[in-house]
Amino acid sequence: MNGILNILKPPGMTSHDVVSVVRKKLNMKKVGHTGTLDPNAAGVLPICIGQATKISQFLLDGKKKYRAELTLGIETNTEDIDGEILRQREVTSSPDEIREAVLSFIGEYKQIPPMYSAIKIKGKKLYELARQGVEIERAERTVTIYHIEIIEIFKEKVIFDVLCSKGTYIRTLCKDIGEVLGCGGVMSFLLRTASSDFSLDTAITIEELQALENVEDILLPMDYPLQHMSKAIVKSAYSKQVLNGNRIYSNYLIDTIHEPIGQEVCVYLEKEFVGFGIVRNEDHNQKYIKILRLLFEKE
């Protein structure tokens, strides 16, 4: 079984808990998620199954969309409402000042990842060190906030939708907004509404998954999140060359290679998605596709 499930992770479960549920349901080991969602957060968690685990990096690299609630006037050790309160301050900013501060984060900005995170430094996850009372210096990371829409500002609460790059911590965004306003802030609610091409309206709950007799009925194809990529469709006569990982020349294809040098493409054998390639150039300026990864299972 190969494909992707769009799971609605409930609060209270880790992303790995969801993977374990799917493994047990399918009686398969080759199952993986595509980007950790905080245990207390809910939302879209695409789960790759079988050969689809080989494309998980493409999903990890995709944009994410969240609905979040920021509570101003509080600072905690975890940067969310569930942590130990370190400091409380009065919120004196007006709604207009709050709006301006929130929207000022649109674009690229440098984040320092929270100590309570799954990032590994020298083989240790940061949250493991944090639980031991150890805090270490973390390098800044550049993230991108593509869009923010403020839904509501009510007293110290701000509800907003945010579209962001991979690796963006919404907890840290909330903390940073609070710092700009001089009162501190924490994330008090988080729902991931989209991850790459997967959205909340097509996600299924754990209960719905458990009730299914045939999971393949809702399994999405491996190339579902890759529709933005160019396709190189190989004629069936050249199947052996493709499956052996040989170079793919224009005459092997239904259509010629139009993509520029260095562009990655999805490789199909007729209608079957079989892997990834990259456009290269020979010395005599003949383009070809070099196979980067094959997804088929050898028999």
Curated annotation (Swiss-Prot):
It is an enzyme of class 5 (isomerase). One of its GO terms (biological process) is tRNA pseudouridine synthesis. Gene3D superfamilies: Pseudouridine synthase. It holds the Pfam family TruB_C_2. Keywords: Isomerase, tRNA processing. It catalyses: uridine(55) in tRNA = pseudouridine(55) in tRNA. Its EC number is 5.4.99.25. GO terms for molecular function: RNA binding; tRNA pseudouridine(55) synthase activity. It comes from the Bacteria. The active site is at 38 (nucleophile). InterPro entries: PsdUridine_synth_cat_dom_sf, PsdUridine_synth_N, tRNA_psdUridine_synth_TruB, TruB_C. Belongs to the pseudouridine synthase TruB family. Type 1 subfamily. Responsible for synthesis of pseudouridine from uracil-55 in the psi GC loop of transfer RNAs. NCBIfam families: TruB. This is tRNA pseudouridine synthase B. It comes from Alkaliphilus oremlandii (strain OhILAs) (Clostridium oremlandii (strain OhILAs)). The lineage of its organism: Bacteria, Bacillati, Bacillota, Clostridia, Peptostreptococcales. The gene is truB.
